[in-house]
């Protein structure tokens, strides 16, 4: 048994075979979000032999991630390494034949428009509905299949959106109000629930790549109560859906710069600059020397502590501010210590 036997088992599965494995090798998959869902999916995609993986995430590895985010190590958390970078490093050890392109960035319409390659399928690993609707609209505009998943507590749901069926807006026309949706901070999260729906996502992505039909309906799981089902949420495209009926894509027109967003499961806020810019981390570190605490400059970010909060500032001008829950205070701290 040698390297040539790596994919011998999946090739024996009906529907894949040698031809399907070759399609996987030639495919490009975009994974949006590198948290619990994203890391499970990334690990499986790399082991499956997907040729190119694009991964975008805005966050850094923290100790609380290690319970459920499978690609990360204690050293990553200690260093505050960007999740996309840490994931790419680990995937290179899993399968050196897979090209992994990490992006430490907010997933925005502008970011998606600048991708170096068009993916064959997109996997949702994010923790907020605003980004999910952006992914839906972008995929719909470019006729790309994508696979949604979300998990909270012991429950999770996943659903494939092929190009020949209805989209997310057909099922849920608008994102739910923020107060109506629990978070992993308020409800917790069990890793087995994540693993189940991430496996579904990867299977659906593989099916899309090899040309097999998508599962119709949503996988719903409750790992604590032992309840598992496929629920038929997908009918025909909604007559009033802007994407499917009018070829409009609202999320692609929404400006996202300059905002502040609470991060799921933590007392932390992401703040974006009012205008996209290249941020000189080294020069800013020199300006802060002697007036802030815990100052540390890495190849990927600048970390420091000030005004009772901890900052991680990235090269695109974004900042994660820890120890702050209020969005207005986070914006004020950003303006004070990073720049308006």
Each language-model region and where it sits:
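Adenine nucleotide-associated cytosolic modules
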Residues: 1-340
